[in-house]
Amino acid sequence: MTQPNLNIVPFVSVDHMMKLVLRVGVETFLKELAGYVEEDFRRWQNFDKTPRVASHSKEGVIELMPTSDGTLYGFKYVNGHPKNTRDGLQTVTAFGVLANVGSGYPMLLTEMTILTALRTAATSAVAAKHLAPKNARTMAIIGNGAQSEFQALAFKAILGVDKLRLYDLDPQATAKCIRNLQGAGFDIVACKSVEEAVEGADIITTVTADKANATILTDNMVGAGVHINAVGGDCPGKTELHGDILRRSDIFVEYPPQTRIEGEIQQLPEDYPVNELWEVITGRIAGRKDARQITLFDSVGFATEDFSALRYVRDKLKDTGLYEQLDLLADPDEPRDLYGMLLRHEKLLQSESTKPAA
């Protein structure tokens, strides 16, 4: 991917993103993206970190997620509106920008609705690689909406999970998930309750959408030795797990100041001890210590993961042509003459309007 004129910014549309993902292959894309996510967790201390800037309403939330490693800057605009599906709209939509810190000029503008689904699943699988039981093959997925297939494929690509136990309040959502994963190499069981779904599961993924303090999992459903991948709780007042599960588990988070506001641990005292995922990945602390330990990844999504996704797409776009050249920036030849640029364009328009018709 080249950027010959600084005023021209490569733009990846939804169509181009889908073509890129399919050209690479979904599982390969997830595996390679997970590598970028893990690489950036390993250099965690290089990043400028802040909780996302959120605007909450009774309908949902709109957020900005910025971060920088000192060389590149990235941000994502993302919403979360659980009731949107009732109107035929997506629960989550997003776009993102990658920029050069030295000049402040953007280098990439891309859709991130599809990319966020991929990066969320890739991050969950990275965490599970360090926290799940060894040789885990069976995963329960509670909530079979837009994120469920991505989670399944990421865990297959990165951990070798090949048995799925699915449950959703809406049987049509489960049927959709099964239909979409046909031929992907899974042994799938559609379950009639959460209790049935978690039976025999090594990994339990909760990925529901309702903006409420729900109790998707209760303490009696969680046996020793499992890994819980809690994805659905991602804003104040939205949780999925009973508090007793948290107190039995070793909890791992992305960025504590954000997770204490938005994650499952919002149910616990502010000083409740948690572990940071980057410290596990870098070997500073242990992840899974024994076979009976319950590990919990309290996932809310953090800006460094979007940064990783933006870096990956930038690198993957090279020589593909899967982007448009967007005339985004007013960049006059004389930087101090922005108004003159406007006047010159006016003259150009006038000359074009007076040209005789061919």
Swiss-Prot record:
L-ornithine binds at residues 52, 76, 119, 234, 300. GO terms for molecular function: ornithine cyclodeaminase activity. NAD(+) binds at residues 91, 119, 146-147, 168, 208, 231-234, 238, 299. InterPro entries: NAD(P)-bd_dom_sf (IPR036291), ODC_Mu_crystall (IPR003462), ODC_N (IPR023401). Keywords: Arginine metabolism, Lyase, NAD. Catalyzes the conversion of L-ornithine into L-proline with release of ammonia. This is Ornithine cyclodeaminase. It comes from Brucella suis biovar 1 (strain 1330). The lineage of its organism: Bacteria, Pseudomonadati, Pseudomonadota, Alphaproteobacteria, Hyphomicrobiales.
